[in-house]
From Swiss-Prot:
One of its GO terms (cellular component) is plasma membrane. Residues 1-43 are annotated as: Disordered. It comes from the Bacteria. It catalyses: K(+)(in) + H(+)(in) = K(+)(out) + H(+)(out). Belongs to the HAK/KUP transporter (TC 2.A.72) family. It comes from Anaeromyxobacter sp. (strain K). PANTHER family: LOW AFFINITY POTASSIUM TRANSPORT SYSTEM PROTEIN KUP, OSMOTIC STRESS POTASSIUM TRANSPORTER. This is Probable potassium transport system protein Kup. The lineage of its organism: Bacteria, Pseudomonadati, Myxococcota, Myxococcia, Myxococcales. Coiled coil: none annotated. The chain crosses the membrane at residues 52-72, 92-112, 147-167, 181-201, 209-229, 255-275, 291-311, 323-343, 381-401, 407-427, 441-461, 465-485.
Amino acid sequence: MSQIPSPNDPASTGAAPSSAAVPAGPSATPAPSPTAGFSLPGHRPPPTGKALAALAVGALGVVYGDIGTSPLYSLKECFGGPHGVHPTDANVLGVLSLVFWAMTFVVTFKYMSFVMRADNRGEGGILALMALVGKTETTRLGRRMLLMLGLFGAALLYGDGIITPAISVLGAVEGVAVAAPAMERAVVPATVVILVFLFLFQKQGTAKVGAVFGPVMLVWFATIAVLGVRGILHDPTILRALLPTHGLSFFARNGWHGFLVLGGVVLVITGGEALYADMGHFGKRPIRVAWLGLAMPALLLNYLGQGALLLHDPGAARNPFYLLAPEWALYPTIAIATAAAIVASQALISGAYSLTQQAIQLGYSPRVTIRHTSQREIGQIYLPEVNWMLGTACLALVLGFQTSSRLASAYGIAVTGTMIVTTLLFHRVMRDRWGWARWKAWPLTSLFLTVDASFFLANVVKFRDGGWFPIAAAALVFTLMSTWKRGRDALALMLKDAGLPLDLFMADVARRKVQRVAGTAVFMTSNPGGVPPVLLHHLKHNKVLHERVVLVSILAHEIPFVNEPERVNARELGSGFFQVIAHYGFMETPDVPALLDSLPRRELAGPRITIVPMETTYFLGRETLLANGPSNIPTWRKRLFIVMARNAQTASAFFGLPPNRVVEMGAQIQL
């Protein structure tokens, strides 16, 4: 089991990498794990019957919101975008053929059949995949390359999370301009109002309304399926598009221009990564059932219906989705589309929260405020700082780009870049985790990369049209995450070198007669084998120790969850000292007071430890970092790291420590 430094450190744990925090500060010394490893959580039998149906409907509301709203703008971009083709019969059949085979190959074949098998104890997503393959890499260079690759993929996902709410809501509200052209100027203001309310609502949590997300998307998929069937019945010849020959002849006929149309076709698979990222919430089977049983058939019917409309009326390319609806159903369709767009946006926002939580626990992001909005659902969280950054960026995109067509140019690069990163990491899973031979793994990887790279290159030409935005956003996030990781590792190394081994300290305490005072003192340390500097400072300056001293280490591991029976190890060190080591996965948030309160109820092999809250004082270190130290990090990165450390959430708040029971002791460190 690979242990990673718990994200704690800089401005919050005494001069030592307080592991009790996940970024309690920039340090975090990975100490040898006191346990040999963790058992796999008990596997529940695959859901069946009503349970499977309920999970599948739930998956519709979370997993398929992004890809489910793609019909609002995908074909409009293929035929009416800056690189669109004229909607002749041959081109319509060719584009629809590409749409069908893109959905079949990328979503059904690549993600459903292969990538979803590469789970990190049930969890999926870029960071979970990176943590999974990182366990098998033994060389320093190899781990560094995997880290950089995974962080850039995660950074691209943030760009996706910014664009999706903007383009989905814009695409839905643009139906108003179809119903009443005079209302076109109201599209952007209406979109802004909806997004403002959406982001303001986040602090309330989705526990109360989350139950309706699935039914809303169920109605949405039923609606688009009916609209599609209506279009197909008007011109059934569109079904010829299912033949791959039409896609191939499209490229032969249009050449380079036809290749560029892939930049619009890729919009039909923009939610593919969500299938993998949300795997831990619903499980593989419900996600597959929802896709094959409803989502894919409904999407395919709607795209074919739009294609049939274009065969009959090429002028409908300006907005084929809404023009597919009969006039009397236009406003109800707009309402349902807007509701679906809000659900899709919520799914991406919640995904950004989850991704940030993972990054914090894995040590790639400074601490931010994490609020649990549901007592029953552990995954229901709200991150105020992330929410406001996403909200501000989304509103800026809407005001800057104005239309979903312009935003579509920015969308594809983030999605296709993430797909390439996933393929490269998945190759390592096949080779290192599954033991596939090169002759078996490389052909599949090459096939995936050929398709991914084709979509990516077709979108690169849109760089000046808006593609620069996700690249800029990803570069910014990547710089922040990599800077935090480098700075934290450097600080951890400095603190480790300056630390004192625990066994030597305990031998010294046993020899010396230090004055003791009543009560319990809790010291946080990220290194179970060392003494936290804050304890040394306390002893040096105050020259006393409490009757009972508890050293708490919270270690973050590269697995999503830790089984409760394996959560805690405790032992008595002698002279009134106790050591508590707690283990957490990257999907969990530690609560130190609750952890200590639970000790008497746990069946621990070590001593029975009872903590009286009003007789307990928590000691934390607060480091003041200076950029003039000996580490080989560039000065600009040191300064950026220091700014991030200063603005990180305090360790006491992150660990839920009672403010009136916390004592902080400062130290100056030259980084």
